[in-house]
């Protein structure tokens, strides 16, 4: 998960999905280009999405020809919960 979060482009993708969940690859690429002037190819963004999916930070599902991507904050929540629980046990 930390490796997935280390890349600034992947963090921007997560920001976009947090702002507007359920986007296609085309929508994500368009928004990244407009908002951040990011010149990454669709293939590069697709690879970034696969890393985020592998880390459990993004989920996707197909509807016909379209594949929609959704942010999943569960892994981050479990991590912060673990740190909080450890902190309360120590106090």
Regions found by a protein language model. Give the residues of each.
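Beta-hairpin "wing" of winged helix-turn-helix
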Residues: 53-63, 70
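Short alpha-helix boundary/capping motifs
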Residues: 29-30, 41, 56-57, 80-81, ...
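Hydrophobic transmembrane alpha-helix bundles
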Residues: 61-67, 79-83
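Phospho-regulated, low-complexity intrinsically disordered regions of nuclear gene-regulatory
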Residues: 73-91
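Short, hydrophobic-biased segments on the C-terminal half of alpha helices
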Residues: 49-50
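Hydrophobic alpha-helical segments
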Residues: 24, 62, 84-88
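N-terminal helix-turn-helix DNA-binding core of bacterial DNA-binding proteins
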Residues: 3-4, 8-41, 66-77
